[in-house]
Structures are given as C-alpha cells and as structure tokens.
Design a protein with these regions (language model features):
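Conserved beta-strand hairpin/beta-sheet module of binuclear metal-dependent hydrolase folds
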Residues: 110-171, 296-300, 304-310
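Metallo-beta-lactamase
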Residues: 120, 144-145, 152-155, 169, 212-288, 332-341, ...
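Divalent-metal (often Zn2+) His-rich catalytic cores of metallo-beta-lactamase-fold enzymes
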Residues: 28-45, 49, 305, 315, ...
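TPR-adjacent "capping" and linker segments in tetratricopeptide-repeat scaffold/adaptor proteins
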Residues: 371, 439-462
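Feature captures hydrophobic
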Residues: 12, 17-19, 466-469, 475-481, ...
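Active-site metal-binding motif and surrounding structural segment of the metallo-beta-lactamase
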Residues: 143-144, 154-206
C-alpha cells in the first residue's frame, strides 16, 4: 500500500556539478550551444553599474565578520558517497567583475553568498552559514547549546554542529528551535539530536503554533508539482558557471541529503510568550502568514540579539515562489516588522536571520527593519491602489517602481522575490487569477491556441523570420511569447526550439533576480536537451510518516485517486488503529475518496485492525500489506480485495513533466 513518496524540493539535486561546454546534441536534435550576451543585455548591465552603489562594501565586511573556520570547499558528503553540498563548483565567483552573461547586481549577491563556515555573531552566539541555503544559529546557554533551525539535511546539520564543536568546544544540545515551516529550516534535525535525546524526549523542540499542519501541507499535498517547478526556481540541473546557475538569491542552491520531519514538543502560541532555555530567556513574536504560514521571531536580552527568522533578509523576498505556494500576506508581513520595532527597537545590538549575514548596531538594525517594513507595505499599497484604478496584474507590474530610497538599498533588491512578480502575487491574493476581461475567462489551452496563433501569424517561417530580427534587436519578451506559441503548435520544430532557447538565455543573462535567471536558463536547457532523467522518488521516511496525522495520510490518498477510472465504483473500508485508538471509515463514491473519523460503517466491504506504526511500515515499504497480514500485524475481515481494487485506482505522479513544451503523454 503506497501513499506517496517523500515530497522534498531537493531530492533531485545533483550537488557539485560543474559547468561544461554545452555543445552536445540533445534528444531533440537541437545543438546545445549557449550564446554570448546580446549587446542590449550588456547595455542593461552597464546602466545598472552606474545606477547602484557598488562602491559600498559594508555587506562584504559584515558577511566576513566573526569568521572562525570552515569545511574545505564547503563540501559535505553523504555516507553513501554522493555529495550533499559543495561550493567548489562556484570557484568562478572569485572575480569581482561580473561577466557579460551575469547581471552585475546578481553577481555581487552571488559573491556575498560564497562566505561560508562558522561565524561569531556576538560572544555566545554563532552561525553556520554557506553550508546550506539556510543558516544554523547556535546560542550558548548555561550548560549546553540551543540550535535554531537545523538546515535542509541530516548530513549538513551534523557537519555544521561538528564545525561548531571543533572551534567552540563540545556542548550538549539542550533545545532545538524551528523558526518556521520550510524544509531548509527543519529537515536536518536528526543531525543534531541523537537517538537517546529523541527517545528520552528531554530535549525540547520548539516551534510556532500550527507548525506541523503547515510543514506537511505544502510538501505532501502539492509536493510532486512543487518539486518539478522548484527545478526552475533553484536551477539544480543547470551547470554552475557564468552561463549557468550562479545563486538562488537566498543562498547558493538547495542541498541534497537525508531529510526527516520531527514533531515539536513545545509550541509558541502568542506574541509575548517567553521561554527560559538553559538559563537564557527568549522573547517570542508570532508572524503567521508572512514568509511562511507559521513563523516566529525572537529576542534574547542576555545577548541583545534579535532574530527575525526569514522576514528581514538581504533581498526582497518572495510573496509567491515559482515552485508554488499560498500567496503570502505582504500587509501582515510589514505589520510584523513594525511590531518588531515597537517591541525591540533600539534594544538589539546584533540582528541575525536564518539566511544571509548579520547586521550590527541598533541604529543600522532599526534602519534595515524600517526599510524592509516599507518595502512590503509599498508593494502592497501601491498594487492595491493601481488595482482599484482598474489596472490588471500585468499592467501593475509594468507600471510600479520602488521609491529611490528603497531601490538603492541593497537588501531591497529582488534577488529572490522581485517587485514585478510580487505585485502579481498581491493582485492574485485579492482578486484571483481572472482579470475580468471576458477574453481571459475561458481561453484555449496552449497547444490549441498555439496552432491558431501560428495560422493567424502567417505560418512558422514568417514567425521565425520576424523573431530572428527582433531577437537581434533585444525584444526578448515578445519574441519569447511568439516563439512559445510556435513550439506548442509544433514541438518538433528544431529551429523554433533553438531560437526560443536563445531568447530565454538572453532573458536569463539580463535578470537581476536569481530565480528569474534560473527559470529562463533551465527553460533554455530543456528546449535544447529535453528533460533531465531522475531517479525514482523514494518512499516517505518513517520519521516523516510518524509526524503526520492519519487524516493527512487519507488526504494524500484522495489526491492520488484517478476520478475517471473510479467512476461508478463504491468502496467502503473500516480502519481501526490499536495503538492510537483512532477509527476511520474510508468511502469511495462519486469518484471522490472521503473519510469519517471516530466511526465505523455497518456493512463495510472490509475492516482492518492494525497499529498505526504498521501502516507507516507499509507506506515506507519496510514491509508489504500481505506480509503484515501473514505476520499477524494486520487483522482483517470482509473482502480484502476491495482494498486492492481501491489502490489500483491510484495514480503514480511523475517526477518530471513538460513545462516549456506540450505534454508528450496524455493525462486524464
């Protein structure tokens, strides 16, 4: 009985891949040759060099401050031999001058994100940075160390903790804090907590309220689609180099490695909550529905240290990531930052976040928080203002400009989020996908509309002739739109694929946003080479399964049901879990799988009694359902083949599906 695989955004990451000359022929027969930067792209870069304060080196000083030591080349290996993380392929970033194929502002951010190792923030507070996309913060108490966020992978977290021990001495981990629900902040928890600590329950795991609900909802329900879309956001399959992946804004990239979700033992419920942890007092502020649906900030009076999690970073953050998520609330985000100023303004002497580098000095800290507050408030209010003048999302994105006071702040640049796509997210939050123009109410899908566009525009050769001319003239955005219609109409047109790839490439070279660059360059690569091949998705880990409620497992089963194949079927199954005391009825009817809790159905097709732990073993493929029945772990009555019939109606989600070209296989 398979529910679904581990829904991580990093499990296809070929870490440590270096750039190679891209000249091989792809499976589509298109020469995989990257092009030089167009003169118009170079002109854009020169204009940016003149517009932004590149002589300001304060960020570089802050990023290097307090350095104690690192791991050579930032390289972390998995016990099975594969590379979990390595900065060695990014050696090309040693040059201060950006090449023509990388936006100079993004080049600057990419170089800042190369600082890696253990850093002292203030005596008693340390950070491991640059060994994952996220940071691990280590806070010394009276007898041990408190770990804030455990990076993406178990291997990375273990290496980070060992690095701290090597330079600061071995101390027991006395508590773990998860600032929010994204995988790069909790995935490595088993790397800092040994089996005894977990079994004894003596080490508290502290997290914001509703942590578990939100930690699993993104990764489990929409995981397959998110995983594929994340490849465009982070660029894991791009070669690393001046013509490939250079950064992702928040850090270098997602880490590979083993991930496990541990359930918190202590939830922070409200702003003003305090905890005394190993003699150190923490003051908490709740920040739900900001960068994550469950997130929190904290201040430590002993160290005069402020940590705003991921809500005050050295870039304009995402309000809607390319991988997909619920739209984040820019208005609430700005209010939380304003509240942080009211709570702790003038009190903090150091501020560190869970990405990027710290800031020191109360005046600089308060200035940065105010500017970040106003960045999200400006984006929110001006989007709504223009929306209420009747502008659509696309029109607002084309119109809005940050005020000069924010535009010139390095930490307000759009390396991860970007003003142009963040305003579209704000529009979506309030008005949804529809712009009220009836032409967009029920348009043709891409293949059908592509064929009609090609017909209306005079055929493929006419489009290609005009596209070549406009590409040379730097009209990349419309050339991409026109050629995309042609590729969807005729995906085997090698000339169209190659020209669209060249166009995406120029858009990537021009992009200041790392995520935009990754998306454009990966789109170009897939047009030239086709989709990369990946390994089968692994089953969910026992730790992740144990962290899920049984009702969440049924939700996952429901989204896998193939409705058309289930039409006309009615299956009712009773479940009784002996270890948790839970009972459920699963009901397939009207091509929908529903469940009721704390009841059993009379006349059910079959009934199963088992431990929830046994179900976890089956899903994790540590045993099979028939083996568990034969071994006495599952007791059944009725027609067990009805369960097999139900499972036969489940889809297996592919790891890969086409994005920049039509789906090759029909989906029903």
């Amino acid at each position: 009985m398979a529910i679904g695989g581990e829904m991580r955004l990093d499990d296809c990451q070929p870490a440590g891949r270096e750039e190679k000359p891209m000249i091989e022929s792809s499976s589509h027969g298109t020469a995989n040759m990257s092009k030089d930067a167009n003169p118009s792209v170079i002109a854009q870069h020169e204009a940016m060099l003149n517009a932004l304060p590149f002589s300001d080196m304060r960020d570089f000083e802050d990023a290097a401050r307090g350095f104690l030591g690192t791991i050579e080349n930032g390289k972390i290996d998995h016990p099975q031999g594969r590379v979990v993380w390595s900065l060695e392929p990014y050696g090309f970033l040693g040059s201060e001058q950006a090449p023509p194929t990388v936006n100079p502002s993004l080049w600057r951010q990419s170089r800042l994100n190369m600082h890696h190792g253990l850093f002292e923030v203030v005596p008693g507070v340390y950070q491991v940075r640059g060994l994952d996309i996220a940071n691990m913060t280590l806070i010394e108490g009276d007898s041990g160390v408190i770990v804030v966020d455990t990076l993406t992978s178990i291997e990375g977290a273990r290496a980070a903790l060992e690095l701290y021990f090597r330079h600061c001495g071995t101390r027991p981990v006395v508590a773990v804090i998860f600032t929010h629900t994204h995988t790069d902040h909790w995935g490595g928890a088993r790397g800092v907590l040994d089996g005894h600590a977990l079994a004894s329950g003596q080490v508290p795991i502290i997290a914001p309220n509703l942590f578990m609900e939100h930690a699993v909802s993104e990764n489990i329900i929409a995981g397959p689609a998110m995983l594929r879309r994340a490849q465009y956001q982070f660029g894991p399959f791009l070669a690393k180099g001046p013509r490939g992946q250079v950064d992702c804004g928040l850090g270098k990239s997602m880490a590979a490695g083993s991930v496990a979700l541990l359930r918190p033992t202590d939830l922070i419920m409200a702003t003003g909550d305090k905890r005394m942890i190993d003699g150190v007092e923490f003051e908490f502020q709740m920040a739900p529905n900001s960068e994550a649906p469950a997130e929190m900030h904290f201040f430590i009076p002993r160290y005069k240290l402020l940590n705003l999690a991921e809500n005050c970073t050295h870039n304009f953050h995402n309000l809607l990531p390319f991988r997909g998520a619920d739209v984040r609330d820019a208005l609430a985000w700005s209010k939380y930052l304003n509240e942080a100023l009211q709570l702790w303004g003038g009190k903090a002497e150091a501020m560190c976040g869970q990405h990027h580098w710290p800031v020191w000095g109360s005046e600089r800290i308060d200035t940065m928080i105010r500017q970040q507050r106003d960045l999200y408030k400006f984006a929110h209010d001006q989007t709504i203002r223009l929306m209420n003048h009747g502008l659509t999302a696309a029109e607002i994105a084309e119109t809005i400009r940050l005020p000069k006071s924010l535009e010139g702040a390095w930490h307000g640049r759009g390396y991860y989020g970007h003003i142009r796509h963040n305003v579209k997210a704000i529009y979506q939050k309030y008005l949804g996908w529809y712009d009220a123009n009836p032409v967009n109410l029920d348009p043709l899908p891409p293949v059908a509309s592509g064929r009609k566009y090609v017909e209306y525009m005079g055929g493929a050769e006419a489009i290609l002739a005009r596209a070549r001319k406009d590409l040379d003239n730097g009209e990349f955005r419309f050339v991409a739109q026109a050629l995309s219609h042609l590729v969807f109409a005729d995906p085997d047109n090698q000339t169209a694929r190659a020209l669209l790839a060249d166009t995406f490439e120029q858009l990537g070279y021009a992009a200041e946003s790392a995520t935009w660059r990754n998306a454009y360059l990966f789109g170009a690569q897939e047009l030239r080479q086709g989709m990369p091949k990946t390994l089968p998705r692994p089953p969910m880990s026992r730790e992740t399964l144990a962290a899920l409620r049984t009702s969440q497992l049924w939700d996952v089963l429901g989204i896998r049901l193939n409705g058309p194949r289930a039409e006309g079927k009615h299956i009712v199954l009773n479940w009784n879990f002996s270890d948790t005391g839970e009972t459920f009825v699963l009901n397939l009817e009207n091509s929908a799988l529903t469940y009721s809790e704390s009841v059993q159905a009379e006349g059910a097709d079959a009934s199963f009694t088992l431990a929830r732990a046994t179900l976890d073993e089956v899903i994790a493929k540590q045993t099979s359902f028939p083996e568990a029945v034969a071994g006495g772990k599952i007791k059944l009555s009725g027609n067990a083949m009805r369960l097999a019939e139900l499972m036969g109606l489940m889809d297996e989600f592919p790891r890969m599906f086409e994005i920049v070209e039509p789906k090759r296989a029909a989906v029903t």
